[in-house]
């Protein structure tokens, strides 16, 4: 039993708890929070309540006045506000054990002063109080979700782990646009990989109900969104007057040629020549297919045939999408994202194009 607790002054405390100070207002305690087998411990957003994990060594090296970011929703607050439910329960147990002993000792002191012998005659009351020793139980452990992989922020090098789509480093805040794009493309690949791991019966049922087709369509839709978000972020970061340059152009970054034109007009390289011709052509077909499913349920129309003149589909037919075509589209989109990121990596862009007067 003695190995499960330690004595601190007049109090028995469970392992992992120590009293670090006292004053007129109360007592200050230190309660250890165990890490997992990788040396990571949990943080929980006070706003969205989702969990993430941070390497304990990296965390200890950060300043005490650190403002932590939720990796999912971007809420930022003092790091002490990110205590997890299990960590809070552990701390409350430590405080509760101390409180039980403190109250017991206060009662013992009070009754010892009040205790008097019974009078030899007449009416009277004899008061006695006997306290029982308190032996604290071990603190509850921490058994939170285990990490899948370790990430490291390219900006601050802090190592952390997430359990869902995220947009922020716990220390630096918003992730670079290219990191967000890379993660999004990785998620699309992982989703296709997950489909391939389904049981045969489940796979057949989902395929018959059109679930696979809907996922393939969603993949193309998401790829366009990834490129739009990345291109817009890169463009806005590179040009102080970006808002003026895209004013009145609608969703220009959803369109491949318009995206390329915006960058070339600003003096940057032409995306159409940064990629090989076959990759650019496949991307154009993917973008046209996505547009067709979004606006015409995948049924071929004249607009599609104009964009993809080499298509063997006829007007009125519904296009089909395969897993292989989705994987190729992801690979091509990855190449496009790398090219977009590289556009502004050069020291200085060429002189912007100026229309003839």
Model region roles, listed by residue range:
Residues 57-67, 159-168:
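Short linker/helix segments within small regulatory modules
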Residues 2-49, 86-147:
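A broadly conserved sequence feature marking short terminus-proximal activation segments
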Residues 57-61, 83, 293:
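Short acidic, glycine/proline-enriched loop segments that cap or flank alpha-helices
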Residues 51-54:
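Structured alpha/beta or helical-core interaction and ligand-binding surfaces enriched in interleaved
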